[in-house]
Amino acid sequence: MKKNEFKFDDIQVNGGEKEARMVPLAVGDELNFTLSKEMFVPRTETINGTTQDWTDIQTDGDIAVSASQLTRRNNGLTLNGKTIKERLASFVDLFSDEGTLKLKVTKVVERDFTQEDGSKSTSRYLKFTVA
């Protein structure tokens, strides 16, 4: 779909998840997106006994990347807006007029933290550049 044909207001965007479950991406990996209504996929999962709702963005290679990963501040992409929906609308602006976008993973940041139950976990945050 061409960018000028895409209507972002038709997309349902759920809030961010507490704990991102993500595919193992590495520095140098490329993600290709083709703009369509179907690339925005609402998800629901129970994580640590709590039901979480979020939105995944599907790549052309059928990899799901959470909207919170793609709209996180300081992730290398220049996005505007305060809410995930506003920042996703800004993400759509990165697409070419033909409706395609290629991102390259430039860094994987890992942060260790202690969960409420005392167990240890690691969060992984991605940094990107438009390829």
Where are the regions that the model predicts?
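OB-fold ssDNA-binding interfaces and closely related basic DNA-contact patches used
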Residues: 1-71, 117, 129-130
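Short nucleic-acid-contacting surface segments enriched for D/E, G, S/T with interspersed K/R
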Residues: 26, 82-104
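OB-fold and OB-like beta-barrel modules that bind single-stranded nucleic acids
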Residues: 33-35, 100-107
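Oxidizing extracytosolic/periplasmic lumen-facing domains
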Residues: 43, 94-95, 113
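Beta-strand-rich binding-surface signature
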Residues: 54, 100-102, 123-125
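Short His-Asn-centered micro-motif
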Residues: 60, 80-82, 106
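GIY-YIG-like beta-to-alpha core
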Residues: 65-87
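OB-fold/S1-family single-stranded nucleic acid-binding modules
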Residues: 106-131
